[in-house]
């Protein structure tokens, strides 16, 4: 979807949202190229929402600074709500509705990963199981805080890592038959 104020795109798995030292093939760079190709006067990319590289989903871009400020304000005041869906797998029982409240900190052994740790920052995740396929569950997730890798860390912490998330204990071999 696109109008004069914002652009909404479906980010595929495997593409980073924003450029970094190791990622130049990003959705933000794609948007910049799109703006140039369209001949837009304002070609500055204002990314409002981001997703991890190995996550697919909807991203929101503001097309000018005023729209970006307004959308940021709406996100802060929770008048725009973000929802996440994930497939998780575990051998125990996953409560049909639950909350995970566990502090998250940087993993001192890695520059990438995070972990649940006493000295970490407060993190709160709510979820509801939408459908189950044996030991695999589709969950509807709402974040009450926005810590790096929060969904991945929290579900791994309770023994239900995200399917395909080998960084936090999910197997790349698993799938739904």
Identify what each model region corresponds to:
Residues 1-177:
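RNA pseudouridine synthases
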């Amino acid at each position: 979807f696109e109008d004069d104020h914002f652009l909404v795109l479906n980010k595929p798995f495997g593409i980073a949202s924003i450029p970094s030292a190791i990622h130049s093939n990003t959705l933000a760079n794609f948007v910049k190229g799109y703006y140039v190709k369209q001949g837009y006067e304002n070609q500055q990319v204002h990314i409002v929402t981001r997703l991890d590289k190995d996550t697919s989903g909807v991203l929101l871009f503001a097309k000018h600074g005023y729209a970006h400020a307004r959308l940021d304000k709406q996100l802060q005041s929770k008048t725009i709500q973000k929802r996440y869906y994930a497939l998780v797998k575990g051998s125990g029982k996953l409560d049909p509705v639950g909350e995970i409240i566990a502090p998250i900190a940087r993993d001192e052994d890695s520059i990438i990963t995070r972990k649940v740790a006493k000295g970490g920052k407060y993190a709160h995740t709510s979820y509801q199981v939408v459908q189950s396929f044996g030991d695999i569950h589709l969950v509807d997730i709402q974040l009450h805080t926005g810590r790096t890798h929060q969904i991945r860390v929290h579900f791994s912490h309770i023994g239900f890592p995200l399917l395909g998330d080998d960084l936090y204990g999910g197997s790349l071999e698993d799938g739904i038959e």
